[in-house]
Amino acid sequence: MDLRLSVISIVAMIALPVFSQEDSIKTVHRIAADAVPATIFHTNEFLRGGNEEIRTMNHDMTFTLKYAFMNRDEVRPGAIHQGVYQGVGLARHEFNRWLANPISVYLFQGAPIVNFSRRVSLNYEWNLGMAFGWNGYDEQSNPENKVIGSKVTAYIDADLYVRWMLSKAFDLNAGISLSHFSNGNTTYPNMGLNTGGI
């Protein structure tokens, strides 16, 4: 299973800029789709098997759809910070029936850290938003869940990835992704949930 997950992860973070167009202010528009298999970090007994099914919770699969925009590299301020992009995203996180499959809405920003060539670069991206639809702690129906205490949580994510420009319209990305879900102690219990994807 781990080997299969590793093989899948090589192509898991595929970003497909479906279109880009030039408008009067020289802005490039992009649409990206990602698939990120992830491991749940066992930071709580509930995740290690302390639940009704006596089941260790190991995996998460996240699917995202993102809209991004950026200045063309040859036009200022794009020339100052080449390759910087920002936008909005929508994600579905597939966990299990005890945690549910929440939907995240978030803002993101990213940029190259190092350009190895005109087509290959090392990049970062951060996401900040909200995740909706958790099966949170409930004294009657989900009493063992001390991880998520509410239906809505904050969603924070940081990615480090290699981008390979296949053409003007298509990129292939592969890297690592760390995510955190928490309601910021607005309700208890709230130990939070952490995942790591590749």
Where do the protein language model's features map onto the residues?
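Transmembrane beta-strands of outer-membrane beta-barrel proteins
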Residues: 29-33, 84-86, 105, 120-128, ...
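Repeated loop/turn-to-beta-strand initiation elements of outer-membrane beta-barrel proteins
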Residues: 41, 73-76, 168-172
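Extracellular loop and loop/strand-boundary signature of outer-membrane beta-barrel proteins
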Residues: 49-53, 93-96, 142-148, 185-192
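Residues on the lipid-exposed face of transmembrane beta-strands in outer-membrane beta-barrel proteins
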Residues: 33, 63-69, 107-113, 126-130, ...
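Residues that define the transmembrane beta-barrel architecture of outer-membrane proteins
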Residues: 27-29, 57-63, 99-105, 150-156, ...
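Short glycine/proline- and aromatic-enriched beta-strand/turn motifs that initiate or cap beta-hairpins
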Residues: 21-58, 62-68
